[in-house]
């Protein structure tokens, strides 16, 4: 039997082809749950027991719940990212090859597995900036049709194709839009979809997206596959746990950042001041001045959630001999001696204790010592606002493929861990001592 949470997760991912859609979906869920939207440009008047959220750039969102007893409060923060590797459409997009082919000019966004994007129906999604009187407004766009394809080269024309793992993104990876087409065909499609005049379109952030829906599979329905599991699976798990739990003595925060796949160094990325700005403004509403803010941060805790690599069934040698993970065996704690992950002895102890209280299994991941792994958002966010932090994720295969695979049972484990976390209060009671209570 497929868990309700799994069905909800897959529907969530299917409906969110870009970071802009993911942020809009989270925003709509929060509004339905009674949260109030704040603008960074306006004065904030926060009340105990109320719930709020703020968006930045339409692609990052921070939500928080005010406790009712905030004499010695802490921030309980869990963070994930809204973006995934894909291809961004360039500003002057159309390439017309005589009167034979029309292609789109694209560039890689993040470190995708290029071959997975070939020979499958694709479309276009993102945001479009529209002129409406004196205002520029942002509109979500999804061209809900099979529109493009990146064709591979026939084996007869490239006999070394199966041996070549290298792709030139400017040559091999440009998508075919059609045969002979008039200039401006893409803009016409966009204007028709949004029901605006072409002249109203002032700008856009558009990406290729796959058309294939998420699936549950395996002889015991134990696996799920979808685009963008990294990292919408963690976004969904954090959001569910955040909405399901409450602690009167804490301020719970769910933070979803854009641009993790390209380094997080944007105004809406985890390396920006977004998290600091929001936490500081919350603290100023609780008690003016910086003293209570610094006290709260010292007792605070953060989960940085980004998926982890599972042992590959055909290549188990790629993973560490005993710090390796499997799908459907629980939440992964990620550790790195070079501090690409924030996990240390204290933060891992906290994660272990919370998991035990929640009845959630934990497993541990470290790279092979002779391999260089990826990085994530936790250590970048900690450079702006420093608190105890642990890096976690869910185990998956084919990370950065356009269609990834994970365990069907793990999302429930993440939700339960987040529920326990958000129901807890943290307090630094002595140097090197963190007390966890309800």
Predicted regions and their residues:
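N-terminal hydrophobic/helix-forming segments and targeting peptides
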Residues: 1-438
């Amino acid at each position: 039997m497929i868990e309700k949470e799994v069905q909800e997760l897959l529907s969530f991912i299917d409906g969110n082809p870009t970071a802009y859609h993911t942020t809009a979906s989270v925003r709509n869920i929060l509004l339905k749950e009674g949260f109030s939207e704040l603008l960074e440009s306006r004065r904030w008047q926060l009340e105990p027991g109320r719930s709020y959220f703020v968006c930045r750039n339409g692609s990052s969102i921070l939500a928080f719940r005010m406790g009712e007893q905030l004499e010695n409060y802490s921030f309980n923060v869990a963070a994930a990212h809204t973006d995934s590797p894909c291809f961004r459409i360039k500003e002057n997009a159309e390439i017309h090859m005589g009167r034979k082919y029309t292609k789109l000019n694209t560039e890689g966004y993040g470190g995708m597995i290029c071959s997975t994007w070939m020979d499958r129906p694709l479309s276009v999604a993102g945001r479009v900036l529209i002129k409406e009187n004196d205002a520029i407004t942002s509109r979500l766009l999804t061209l809900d049709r099979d529109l493009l394809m990146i064709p591979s080269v026939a084996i007869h024309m490239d006999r070394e194709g199966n041996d070549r793992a290298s792709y030139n993104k400017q040559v091999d990876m440009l998508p075919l839009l059609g045969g002979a087409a008039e200039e401006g065909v893409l803009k016409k499609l966009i204007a028709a979809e949004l029901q605006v005049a072409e002249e109203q379109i002032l700008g856009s952030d558009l990406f290729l997206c796959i058309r294939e829906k998420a699936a549950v599979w395996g002889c015991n329905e134990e696996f799920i596959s979808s685009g963008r599991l990294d990292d919408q699976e963690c976004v969904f798990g954090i959001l569910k746990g955040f909405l399901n739990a409450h602690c009167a003595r804490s301020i719970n925060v769910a933070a979803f950042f854009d641009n993790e796949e390209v380094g997080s160094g944007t105004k809406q990325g985890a390396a920006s001041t977004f998290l600091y700005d929001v936490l500081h403004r919350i603290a100023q509403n609780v008690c003016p001045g910086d003293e209570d803010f610094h006290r709260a941060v010292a007792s605070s805790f953060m989960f940085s959630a980004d998926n982890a690599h599972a042992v590959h069934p055909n290549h188990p040698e790629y993973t560490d001999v005993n710090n390796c993970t499997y799908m459907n065996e629980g939440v992964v704690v990620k550790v790195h001696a070079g501090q690409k992950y924030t996990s240390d002895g204290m933060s891992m102890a906290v994660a272990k204790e919370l998991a035990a209280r929640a009845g959630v299994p934990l497993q541990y991941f470290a790279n092979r010592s002779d391999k260089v792994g990826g990085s994530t958002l936790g250590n970048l966010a900690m450079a702006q606002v420093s608190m105890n932090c642990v890096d976690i994720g869910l185990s998956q295969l084919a990370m950065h493929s356009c269609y990834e695979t994970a365990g069907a049972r793990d999302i429930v484990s993440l939700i339960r861990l987040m529920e326990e976390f958000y129901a807890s209060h943290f307090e630094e009671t002595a140097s090197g001592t963190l007390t966890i209570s309800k």
